[in-house]
Amino acid sequence: MAEAPGDIERLIELMARLPGLGPRSARRAVLVMLKKRGAVMAPLAQAMAEVAATARDCARCGNITSADLCDICRDDRRATGELCVVEDVADLWALERAGVFRGRYHVLGGVLSALDSVGPDELRIPRLAERVRDEGISEVILALNATVDGQTTAHYIADVLEPSGVQVTSLAQGVPIGGELDYLDDGTIGAALRARRRF
């Protein structure tokens, strides 16, 4: 079986490092790019070079931006008293796609993890406490994933912020829209029952 030339094989190996792309998917993607060099590969390479040169973390919230502050932090129409804490930028983007939250964000950059030796100083938790103190935040919404590390991080943040008197809330957990009880795990059903509200 013929192998791809070395430089193309290197590109395939790099593509395979991306989440959701295994070796076969990466190979197919590279073949499509090679087939459509002018329409796909060249613009993609240019866009990647531009983003690599300009992308950085927002100085205030940790979102990805090409300026000192991201568009959300610069938006004067945002509610300045509400601060939504997320694990990473993908979570921020998911909340923005929903189009419901009109406050500001704080990206932690991960979660506390004893196994991975990730402590509060490796995350943006000290910066979060500063923002609550300095920006007049009235509510911190913890929008962290319902994993053991996510919930450990949420409890830690609540403890850190308790002396400030800020209201700390978390996202409701339970039955997803369109979900059927028979397909849900026991933990999700229990969380939904505990978070029930008047109909």
Swiss-Prot record:
Q: Locate the Toprim domain: which residues? A: 81-176
Q: Which Pfam families match?
A: RecR_C (PF21175), RecR_HhH (PF21176), RecR_ZnF (PF02132), Toprim_4 (PF13662)
A single GO molecular-function term is:
DNA binding
- UniProt record, GO biological process: DNA recombination; DNA repair
Q: Could you tell me the keywords of this UniProt record?
A: DNA damage, DNA recombination, DNA repair, Metal-binding, Zinc, Zinc-finger
C4-type zinc finger locations on the chain: 58-73
Task: Return the CDD domains for the record.
Answer: TOPRIM_recR (cd01025)
Matching entries from InterPro entries are given as: DNA_Rcmb_RecR, Rcmb_RecR, Rcmb_RecR_Znf, TOPRIM_dom, TOPRIM_RecR
Q: Which PANTHER family match?
A: RECOMBINATION PROTEIN RECR
Q: What does this protein do?
A: May play a role in DNA repair. It seems to be involved in an RecBC-independent recombinational process of DNA repair. It may act with RecF and RecO.
Q: What family classification does the UniProt entry report for this protein?
A: Belongs to the RecR family.
The protein, known as = Recombination protein RecR
Q: Which organism is it from?
A: Cereibacter sphaeroides (strain ATCC 17025 / ATH 2.4.3) (Rhodobacter sphaeroides)
